[in-house]
């Protein structure tokens, strides 16, 4: 039996420790650089849940200190807000048998309405200065918000001036659309009081209108950045018609609802161990491949592992190659064009298909990338869903 060989690859997850890969007895074995106890595992779980992806390399040096104090202020503000809300509810008559629902609702709407009006006026007067002095106005906003909550707590002690006080408080706290909605609500509330049928009818109407308006709003957005879906749409159209869609055309074709069609999943930024399990598979992954990423098919998914410093253009190339493989692996009739050849080679084995896909992507990608840039697509800032695993193999891993 062969002894342990020298490390041939290293692997990191975000800014955590490195793992080394060795060849042992014909197998790829991963060895941790240091023992990881339960404490470090819990710490890693905490980081992955509560800190940004790639922390601390993905954020500025002041991030942790700012987030600590921002969390403290948000927590204390939340408690203060709950106290002021309780006082406001008591002031409008919650728990008082003599208070009517309509009167309480109108008082609450007046409170919010004056707040939104104040917000509109403030944005009109000081809007251009907010970006210039963001830190100053952030602090001013918090102070005014605390003053408003104090006034709301104080208001029930002065029943005769309750509405006036909460309206003034609302000016400190709180846009034109919401204000218009409140004005309409002032008309609707007396009509729906003690009328459940009209209440449900109007609720259903406004809910449908809300969802329809949201759908149309999302549909109207045109994004020039590339995500996996838009890149897949662009690549398939290019392979079939030899043309690049404009951002407007591609965004109109992009689905906005979850797609439940059967697809071959694409996993970006996987561990090396998820892609290769033996020296033979490693050699197959490197065949015809001089790129800063490794790609293959494992357990019904197209898997891609990448180096640490991979240019954005190579990220696009990796995803394009993964899309080609994913399409070629779909059951059913073989696609037309260049992907048909890929499907034919796939009958000889998955790694043969991967090797052929390297040749395919080298032929089509330069002109495809030039076309993306010519049609206004951003190729330096991407929205591709890479996991944090980074692998260095070959000479770079020594």
Where are the language model's segments positioned?
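Short acidic, glycine/proline-enriched loop segments that cap or flank alpha-helices
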Residues: 188-196
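Helix-loop boundary and gating motifs at the non-cytosolic
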Residues: 11, 19-119, 162
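Extended, charged interaction scaffolds in large complex subunits
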Residues: 2-9, 18-20, 198, 202-398
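Short, surface-exposed helix-loop/turn micro-motifs enriched in polar/charged residues
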Residues: 98, 132-135, 160-163, 179, ...
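Transmembrane helix-loop junctions in multipass membrane proteins, especially transporters and channels
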Residues: 82, 86-94, 124-131, 157-161, ...
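Helix-loop boundary elements of multi-pass alpha-helical membrane proteins
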Residues: 52-67, 117-143, 192-193
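Hydrophobic alpha-helical cores of multi-pass transmembrane domains in eukaryotic membrane proteins
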Residues: 68-83, 105-121, 140-154, 164-188, ...
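Interhelical loop segments of eukaryotic multi-pass membrane proteins
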Residues: 89-107, 127-137, 141, 201-202, ...
